[in-house]
């Protein structure tokens, strides 16, 4: 989004070059342009505005930039953009070495209204290898889930396969889920560690003390990032998900040197984007001002990152317990029920539009929605008027697996626009919520996760939420939003929500997918600032809305032991009309797809004849 300039579709493509290579030149060959018949009036990209308390001086400065942009383009008939293709940055995703290019296939002449379409664009990348590079320097990293992400990202993914070692070479140890926490957290974390292990994840809890003693860095944050950079490839641990556990100062977030006039955001995206060491990316000039405009950071996260933003052991244990319970709960009255809280941003921006767009998905045909909009102002029907007391009473009495609100925000709540302008949700809502039915929450508002304050996102994680995605500083919205291509916070909201509710993505994977999509499709106003402020997810990154059935093969009676009682249980089920294993698959000890007498025999051989262990 370039406010004031023609709103033309464009996309950033990631193109792989051989590992170790450095791009020396990028050029573009265009096929013949097609002049579309007629004349066109392409509107300018609108100016996003903050969805909180606006600083009038900052707004006037941004408005002046918008007007200058408009005059510079619409005041002449010069082609816009000047080039169909543009080099954006060097980048990386895990083992892959990438070059980002932006392609805008339409060229607009504002005064005459001519529009030229270029259907064929060839990208040429020249590269060279640095002195001393050898094939031994190539990272070994072959993880099926991450390869599927790479295939989504990389334009020439198939071509790149011949450049890397094949197979599933792994390190001496394998931990695809890493928890970074303060010492003495084993007991509070046990409910989540046990649950993730049952799901098939290989979990390792690593303390900040151990990292600090074994890795170098300017501060603890850099040491943690260096640890993750070292261990994430599959030739080491094969890390895919990272959960940070601790207050912002105990397990530090990274303060970023981006400021839209409302303060610098802290982010956990620093721990997700691991392509290069700090000295070559986040702090390239070594001035310890991370994330400056000059710092060459890319926007493809190597790992999914979430955080439990508490150090208190009792709170951590409670969040771990409800995280496991959330995924185990299969009641559709809960897991397919959404609460939609849509206020106006401005008079032309009713967030009921956003709410209705998000739930218009084929997989939601059997879901239940409870709507609260600004009645008397919104043209959309709702079940309740959007007011504080209504939200508190309805939410606390209901069962909602996903809650979405959109409205002007602060560190402590979100607000309606009309009548009183009151908060419809705030930190004082949380004590009333039923934590037996916590929700994944997307907060489309300013500052709801602002780490300089005791924010509502953190309060929700203590009571009411099992995941929370909000902005760590003042956020931007798009006026008149009615389509995901309009960008800003509403589009991030749309993409995160639709990914999570599809049941195909965990909240951590949905978070990174949505951030990546926003970047590659040019939907941000201030790319670094907004990627950073939306780069902190509260909660377990491996948590999803799909119900997870966990069981141990052979534990037919579900007593957490494999013994002769399981063989007897199976025989009673098969021949005495006894109860069935729950789930039935738990009785399939020999993993042949059937539950029959062979499974009871298999168990007896394992227990008394040194036969192979049950396994799924």
Q: What does each model-found stretch correspond to?
A:
Residues 548-616:
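Cellulosome-associated attachment modules in secreted, modular CAZymes
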